[in-house]
């Protein structure tokens, strides 16, 4: 079950599996890809085409379930994309659970062989459809796949860099059900398979676990690392020496304090990675008497945001710690742990993160010490007195800036509008995010994406930071803590801008 970045995923994964000496899987593909001549090629490569929706067609659904069951009974592996479609933002999409539910229902037929799910992370230094994604995010309708599109793609072929394929920790469905639903075998019937009450919740939990394991196997590369650095800088540009220094910082951080042991980090040096990235002709190089400046063209900012989103979750905790250290200059281990404990559950919901490793914070801070950015004496932590140290921590801290601003909009509105209805909060938060984006030139699509905002509000409820009653939504004391943290972490001018917008909108709603 891979993530879905591009139509190239079909070929890359199948090709890799074949060259590992394994039997390529049957592939569930959207019916939109069944056109001449691609359809025949895909079908001969193992694809079977399915409709986007089975709603209202019980016969089609029943026939497909039987087909899927027969594949499993005969021991064939099956590949399907749990996101249901290609991500247009670079973030993992919320999982679609239909195929996974059918897989579990097939097990309830009494299949006498174990079934395992293998989560797969796929990443690229260039996604062929990226310009199409940007047009769709800008509001253009999605165009159907066609022969003309194939010829255009062939015509535009060039050095697209490297593709990355990482296998996450496999999940044994039998073992999962034994642990989570010990009585699942009582629902087994060879012909008359029903939907037991536990099926829906267990499918949802299993789907989330798959997504967590995909993101735990992310691949860092030259393009997404440079995007992480350049996008947070003014004019999206940085001198070559400073860029290399920050890149070295990130490489050391990920090698010594990786979010997961499945994450892959390039073996090359910072200079080699930059040289490779420049060969892809994605970055502008501006030379003057002081040296070279590496820049992202302003028109392509959204494009690079896609690549940054592939790996932003790997920097979530280090970025929050760096921002806290930059703002406070002095802190304690207890304060760092309290900060991460408050925000990590929110990050985990948004980016499909695994449970926090109790040693992760210590490893990140130790990496900062190794690079002479901070000093630790007992429980006390302070940053070293150098401009270079401040610049590196500030740059890393900025990686979470837009995420925290989005949080501040929602939390601020709840704090000033106690009793607001959930639907109104979702709508008003999107309006406020769009306004803030206009004022500050924020063009990142997910900043004001309603689905992302709705997901955050759901996360607040799950964490019991808000309660929903007949009188509307009410924030808890813990939500006040989040509010105060955000106020301390965000730049004063940004916070003031958010606060002004929230207060104005709240007053407008009352009137």
Predicted regions span which residues?
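Membrane-interfacial terminal anchoring regions of lipid-handling membrane enzymes
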Residues: 1-511
């Amino acid at each position: 079950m891979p993530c879905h970045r591009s139509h190239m995923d079909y070929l890359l994964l199948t090709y890799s599996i074949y060259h590992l000496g394994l039997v390529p899987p049957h592939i569930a593909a959207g019916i939109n890809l069944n056109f001449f001549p691609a359809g025949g090629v895909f079908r001969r490569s193992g694809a079977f085409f399915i409709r986007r929706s089975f709603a209202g067609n019980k016969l089609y659904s029943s026939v497909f379930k039987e087909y899927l069951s027969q594949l499993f009974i005969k021991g064939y592996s099956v590949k399907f994309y749990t996101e249901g479609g290609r991500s247009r933002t670079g973030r993992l999409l919320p999982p679609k659970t239909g195929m996974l539910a059918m897989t579990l229902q097939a097990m309830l037929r009494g299949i006498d062989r174990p079934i395992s799910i293998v989560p797969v992370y796929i990443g690229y230094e260039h996604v062929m459809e990226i310009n199409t994604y940007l047009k769709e995010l800008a509001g253009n309708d999605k165009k159907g796949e066609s022969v003309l599109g194939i010829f255009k793609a062939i015509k535009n072929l060039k050095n697209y860099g490297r593709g990355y394929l990482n296998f996450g920790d496999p999940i044994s469905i039998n073992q999962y059900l034994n642990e989570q639903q010990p009585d699942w075998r009582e629902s087994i019937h060879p012909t008359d398979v029903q939907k037991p009450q536990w099926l829906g919740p267990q499918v949802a939990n299993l789907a989330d676990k798959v997504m967590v394991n995909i993101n735990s196997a992310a691949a860092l590369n030259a393009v997404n690392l440079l995007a992480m650095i350049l996008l947070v800088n003014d004019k999206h540009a940085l001198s070559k020496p400073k860029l290399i220094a920050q890149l070295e910082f990130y490489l050391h951080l990920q090698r010594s304090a990786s979010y997961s042991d499945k994450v892959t980090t390039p073996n090359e040096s910072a200079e080699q990675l930059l040289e490779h990235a420049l060969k892809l002709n994605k970055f502008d190089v501006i030379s003057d008497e002081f040296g070279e400046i590496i820049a992202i063209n302003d028109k392509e900012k959204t494009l690079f945001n896609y690549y940054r989103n592939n790996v932003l979750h790997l920097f979530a905790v280090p970025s929050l710690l760096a921002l806290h250290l930059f703002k406070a200059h002095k802190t304690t281990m207890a304060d760092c742990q309290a900060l991460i404990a408050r925000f990590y559950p929110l990050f985990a919901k948004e980016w499909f993160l695994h449970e926090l490793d109790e040693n992760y914070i210590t490893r990140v801070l130790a990496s900062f010490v190794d690079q002479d950015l901070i000093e630790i004496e007992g429980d006390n932590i302070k940053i070293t007195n150098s401009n270079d140290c401040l610049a590196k921590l500030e740059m890393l801290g900025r990686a979470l800036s837009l995420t925290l601003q989005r949080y501040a909009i929602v939390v601020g509105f709840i704090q000033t509008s106690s009793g607001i209805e959930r639907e109104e909060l979702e709508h008003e938060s999107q309006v406020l995010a769009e306004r803030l984006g206009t004022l500050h030139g924020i063009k990142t699509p997910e900043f004001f994406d309603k689905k992302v905002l709705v997901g955050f509000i759901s996360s607040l409820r799950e964490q019991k930071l808000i309660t929903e009653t007949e009188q509307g939504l009410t924030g808890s004391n813990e939500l006040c803590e989040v509010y105060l943290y955000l106020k301390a972490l965000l730049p004063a001018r940004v916070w003031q801008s958010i606060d002004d917008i929230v207060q104005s909108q709240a007053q407008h709603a009352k009137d």
